[in-house]
């Protein structure tokens, strides 16, 4: 297996201070059996980057470069969110602060439900998708960031269901499984989620 030189360093900074994301990533790396130590940027006192990009890809790269510059280590960043076509793709890159305050899951969910009220017709399903973009940089000025993208299709419920996960998981319905994302275990979710898909592509890149 040919691996990039950064892989031999044995550690990778995860450019996130989101506890839910960090927990999912730690579980994903454990499941994928990758011999890489994941160091959440908070453990290195790295503050959040200013996300001023206009796309998931741009923001993921911004966050990865920020963490790599401060730590001097390779860094991986996740930029993810939920996109609803009838809302023009919103909440999109603003998913974490959709209701105003960053990371207020309850308020974000309530705003999404309220914004969808005019589109609820005769019980018709409203399509939604979770998007995850991972950006990996070997150093802060890496001219060729590696990008891995996962998209998870589903529907938006009219009320929350389930106690697991975080973010919009309680509103994300999987018709083929007849459960919400918040009703899946971490292991079940990681096998099929947007983040799980992107991580699998990352793993495959290490085997090329």
UniProtKB/Swiss-Prot annotation:
Its cofactor is Mg(2+). It catalyses: XTP + H2O = XMP + diphosphate + H(+); dITP + H2O = dIMP + diphosphate + H(+); ITP + H2O = IMP + diphosphate + H(+). One of its GO terms (cellular component) is cytosol. It comes from the Bacteria. SUPFAM superfamilies: ITPase-like. Substrate binds at residues 16-21, 80, 166-169, 189, 194-195. GO terms for molecular function: dITP diphosphatase activity; ITP diphosphatase activity; metal ion binding; nucleotide binding; ribonucleoside triphosphate phosphatase activity; XTP diphosphatase activity. Its EC number is 3.6.1.66. Pyrophosphatase that catalyzes the hydrolysis of nucleoside triphosphates to their monophosphate derivatives, with a high preference for the non-canonical purine nucleotides XTP (xanthosine triphosphate), dITP (deoxyinosine triphosphate) and ITP. Seems to function as a house-cleaning enzyme that removes non-canonical purine nucleotides from the nucleotide pool, thus preventing their incorporation into DNA/RNA and avoiding chromosomal lesions. HAMAP family: Non_canon_purine_NTPase. Belongs to the HAM1 NTPase family. This is dITP/XTP pyrophosphatase.
């Amino acid at each position: 297996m040919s691996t990039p030189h950064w892989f031999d360093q044995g550690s990778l900074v995860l450019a996130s201070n989101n506890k839910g994301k960090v927990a999912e990533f730690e579980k994903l790396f454990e499941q994928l059996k990758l011999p890489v130590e994941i160091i959440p940027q908070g453990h290195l006192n790295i503050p959040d980057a200013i996300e001023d990009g206009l796309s998931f890809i741009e923001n993921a790269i911004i966050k990865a470069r920020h963490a790599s510059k401060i730590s001097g280590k390779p860094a991986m960043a996740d930029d993810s969110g939920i996109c609803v076509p009838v809302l023009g793709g919103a909440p999109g890159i603003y998913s974490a602060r959709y209701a105003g305050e960053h990371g207020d899951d309850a308020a974000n969910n309530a705003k999404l439900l309220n914004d969808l009220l005019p589109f609820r017709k005769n019980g018709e399903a409203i399509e939604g998708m979770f998007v995850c973009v991972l950006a990996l940089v070997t150093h802060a000025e890496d001219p060729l960031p590696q990008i891995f993208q996962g998209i998870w299709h589903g529907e938006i419920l009219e009320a929350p269901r389930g106690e697991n996960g975080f973010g919009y998981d309680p509103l994300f319905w999987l018709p083929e499984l007849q459960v919400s994302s918040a009703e899946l275990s971490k292991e079940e979710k990681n096998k099929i989620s947007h983040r799980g898909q992107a991580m699998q592509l990352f793993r495959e890149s290490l085997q090329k």
